[in-house]
Curated annotation (Swiss-Prot):
Record protein name field: Chloride intracellular channel protein 6
Segments carrying motif G-site: 379-382
Domain of life according to the entry: Eukaryota
Organism whose genome encodes this protein: Mus musculus
Positions of disulphide bridges: none
Gene field: Clic6
Complex formation: Monomer (soluble state). Interacts with dopamine receptors DRD2, DRD3 and DRD4.
Domain comment quoted from the record: The active G-site contains a monothiol Cys-X-X-Ser motif which mediates glutathione-dependent redox catalysis. Members of this family may change from a globular, soluble state to a state where the N-terminal domain is inserted into the membrane and functions as a chloride channel. The redox status of the active cysteine in Cys-X-X-Cys/Ser motif likely determines the capacity to adopt a soluble or membrane-inserted state. A conformation change of the N-terminal domain is thought to expose hydrophobic surfaces that trigger membrane insertion.
């Protein structure tokens, strides 16, 4: 998306000579026959003593290619590159000069520049034409003695003003087309690029040639196309913003759908999601997928990263200080902002071959943003992947994505997908379960630890707890509350029993003492595993929401669950990836409706 930049215009009339004027003077052709054909003697004096005709004709020749060496910042009124405002003094006058000065005070040339000595200008122009191998055309009045230069310049200005009004010059004929395409006040920048000379330089075109004009016209066309694309992209983003307001749902639908998605992931049946929520059929865009987006099924508008690339450095610096969404901008990023690299920054060193266990990877994790649009939002699947990457010890970036703002760059990055998803060395990964498997296979020892469980039972422990919680928290009937609470307690008791049961490696066959209660910290031992990354975020949500909206707490006799949670709260990999309690409570503020 092309950004509107500050146009570098120039003041009209900064050219020493009017454009395209071919003034020969009335009654002067007869002077061509004076003194016979003594062109050789007069040719040496022509650069200094040329009259208004040669001066004007040389200026007309210079219109095509004097952009780079002139002190006025590129093409002037003669050139279509500067837009419609840069016209001759006769056509635009003082208002055009004032407007150009306001837009680019440094690029504006004082009116006094028009009074530059004509002899010096003609000399530079003539030499430029000769350098192209073209014989300069010398009108008849060039062989007569120069008249009053003030009167000559006045005549030239008057005639050039008539030509400007009549549209005689080629540059002025193109200007209305440029204005129509680019829109009001959308003049292109100096097409030659870079500094184009100082104001003190003479306006002679020593290196003038028609080629720069062709290049300039091509640049104008390209930039105009960019402006049109930017306008279309802006309109698309505006339509998408209005569409987002229509499709946006409240926190209750988000939490309810999220619970159902968690249950569906646990049971491996996406059909169950529709049965539990009863809201999927009403969604306008069912093709959008993502376990954490809840009922806010919004498709990001069309767009690209190009619009943000110009501001990527600024956005990366700001993102180090706060959590914010990507994806913009400019990438800002409009869609989200990076939280910064986790586990430090990549060290400079020799490039490693692909497949080397020590190879650094370019990893970015996109997680759901909170209701403020910046902080980490309530999403157990986002936290699951966050924990896995942290435990692996790999360097990665985290970007929060605000679904309500519908970042345009996500449409190109992961069309139809809501967070969490990941980019790994430029490859987009969207399925949470497959991402977990991929990371376990790709990030292997000795550089990265193995996170798989040693006991298969640990993977299924507590897999029905969140489903029972969802039914319990969404129930609004008091007479049914006891039933749902008992179902939840039954699932929790099953989990507590597994946590208190000693694992085989905890039992010492040679010991005379029997171990009856496990003292391990986590599901599969004293280290966090993939099973913990899956269960702990859900268990934490149950603890916060049940207490807030149902005044329900895990029974104190469930020592296994309390030991499990307390050990998790002592680990940075868990606490630093958890959303704030207020984020979790806000997500369920309407889903946990009051019982009647």
């Amino acid at each position: 998306m092309a950004e509107a930049t500050e146009p570098k215009e120039v003041a009209p009339g900064s050219q020493g000579q009017p454009e395209g004027a071919t003034i020969e003077g009335p009654g002067e052709p007869g002077a061509a026959d004076l003194e016979g054909r003594e062109a050789s003697e007069e040719a040496a004096e022509a650069p200094r003593d040329l009259g208004a005709g040669v001066e004007a004709r040389a200026s007309g020749k210079e219109e095509g290619g004097c952009g780079q060496d002139e002190g006025t910042g590129g093409a002037q009124a003669q050139d279509p590159r500067t837009g419609p405002e840069a016209e001759t003094p006769g056509a635009s006058g003082a208002p055009g000069e004032a407007e150009a000065a306001e837009r680019d005070p440094e690029g504006a040339i004082p009116q006094g520049a028009e009074e530059a000595p004509s002899a010096q200008q003609v000399q530079g122009m003539s030499s430029g034409l000769d350098s192209q191998g073209e014989a300069p055309e010398v009108p008849g009045d060039s062989r007569r003695e120069p008249e009053d230069p003030t009167a000559s310049e006045a005549g030239e200005e008057a005639e050039s003003g008539q030509e400007a009004q009549g549209g005689g010059a080629l540059g002025l004929q193109i200007n209305p087309e440029v204005q129509g395409l680019a829109g009001d006040n959308m003049d292109t920048e100096a097409p030659a690029g870079g500094p184009l000379g100082s104001e003190s330089e003479p306006q002679g075109g020593g290196e003038s040639s028609p080629q720069p004009q062709d290049e300039a016209i091509e640049i104008v066309t390209t930039e105009i196309g960019g402006n049109e694309s930017g306008e279309l992209a802006g309109a698309s983003a505006a339509d998408a913003a209005g569409e987002g307001e229509t499709l946006g749902k409240d926190g209750s639908e988000e939490a309810a759908s999220e619970d159902a998605r968690v249950d569906a992931h646990e049971n491996g049946d996406q059909g169950k999601l529709q049965e539990e929520t009863g809201e999927e059929e009403a969604r306008p865009e069912p093709e959008l997928k993502g376990p954490c987006e809840g009922a806010i099924q919004e498709k990001p508008p069309d767009g690209s990263l190009d619009g943000e690339e110009a501001k990527s450095t600024e956005h990366e610096e700001e993102s180090q200080a706060e959590l914010s969404n990507h994806l913009a901008e400019e990438p800002s990023v409009q869609g989200g902002e990076e939280l910064g690299r986790v586990n430090g920054r990549r060290e400079n060193g020799p490039a490693l071959e692909e497949g080397d266990p020590g190879q650094e990877h370019d990893i970015t994790l996109f997680v759901k943003a909170g209701y403020d649009g910046e902080s980490i939002g309530n999403c157990p699947f986002s936290q699951r992947l966050f924990m896995i990457l942290w435990l692996k010890g790999v360097i990665f970036n985290v970007t929060t994505v605000d679904l309500k703002r519908k970042p345009a760059d996500l449409q190109n990055l992961a069309p139809g997908t809501n967070p969490p998803f990941m980019t790994f060395d430029g490859e987009v990964k969207t399925d949470v379960n497959k991402i977990e498997e991929f990371l376990e296979e790709k990030l292997v020892p000795p550089r990265y630890p193995k996170l798989g469980t040693q006991h298969p039972e640990s993977n299924s422990a507590g897999n029905d707890v969140f489903a029972k919680f969802s039914a319990f928290i969404k129930n609004t009937k008091k007479d049914a509350n006891e039933i749902y609470e008992k179902n939840l307690l039954r699932a929790l008791k099953k989990l507590d029993s597994y946590l208190n049961s000693p694992l085989p490696d905890e039992i010492d066959a040679d010991s005379s003492e029997d171990v009856t209660v496990s003292q391990r910290k986590f599901l599969d031992g004293d280290e966090l595993t993939l099973a913990d990354c899956n269960l702990l975020p859900k268990l934490h949500i149950i603890k916060i929401v049940a207490k807030k909206y149902r005044d329900f707490e895990f029974p104190s006799e469930m020592t296994g669950i309390w030991r499990y949670l307390n050990n998790a709260y002592a680990r940075d990999e868990f606490t630093n990836t958890c959303p704030a309690d207020r984020e979790i409570e806000h997500a369920y503020s309407d889903a946990a409706k009051r019982m009647k």
